[in-house]
Regions:
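Metal-cofactor-dependent catalytic cores
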Residues: 1-192
């Protein structure tokens, strides 16, 4: 989607009004809403079905080719193998579903991604795949601000935005397999 991004930016008031809908996401029985691979820089391809690999992450995505400032050797960060964003949060900032993939995440879910609901170590089972929520922070960037507005980026960085994980979560692959749009998501939290 290439467009005049500024035409779609929402005001701080409009964003604040939508937070209750994000908070109302299911805690335990979610659903996969969208799967996206990034085959090349700036490209997005939506999938109905995706393969997830223990090493590659989402097959066809360039995650494995991207370096990270968070790894000693500058290689890909294994704790950010697959990124997951709330479909309610992306709908809040992006509006039209055709713009969701611009957020740059790979899996969009209708599930409460908040820190209280999904502490580090929580396992998400979707389709045949298991993803573990990692402590690696998932934060907004200049591209996010350009596409969705500075107010959207600011909201993700507020205490509420961070607690709700509006920008999403990072995960690593525990079990490879197939995932499909429409798959249910089961949540297994770590033992206390």
């Amino acid at each position: 989607v290439t467009d005049n991004h500024a035409a779609f930016h929402r005001s701080a008031d409009d964003l604040a009004i939508g937070l209750d809908h994000v908070r109302d996401a299911p805690a335990d029985d979610g659903v996969v809403e969208l799967l996206v691979v990034r085959p090349r820089l700036g490209e997005r391809r939506e999938l109905a079905t995706a393969e997830v690999d223990l090493v590659l992450g989402l097959v066809g995505d360039t995650w494995i080719e991207r370096g990270s400032r968070r790894t000693p050797d500058g290689g890909p960060n294994p704790d950010a193998q697959v990124t997951v964003m709330s479909s309610r949060a992306v709908e809040l900032v992006a509006g039209d579903r055709a713009r969701w993939a611009l957020a740059g995440d790979q899996v969009y879910v209708d599930l409460d991604l908040s820190l209280d609901n999904l502490p580090t170590g929580t396992v998400l089972a979707l389709g045949e795949v298991e993803l573990e929520v990692t402590a690696a922070p998932h934060t907004g960037c200049a591209k996010f601000a350009e596409r969705f507005g500075t107010e959207a980026l600011r909201l993700t960085a507020t205490p509420d935005g961070r607690a709700l994980r509006l920008r999403g979560i990072n995960t690593r692959v525990l079990r490879a397999g197939t995932v499909r749009v429409g798959d249910r998501i089961a949540v297994r939290r770590p033992a206390s």
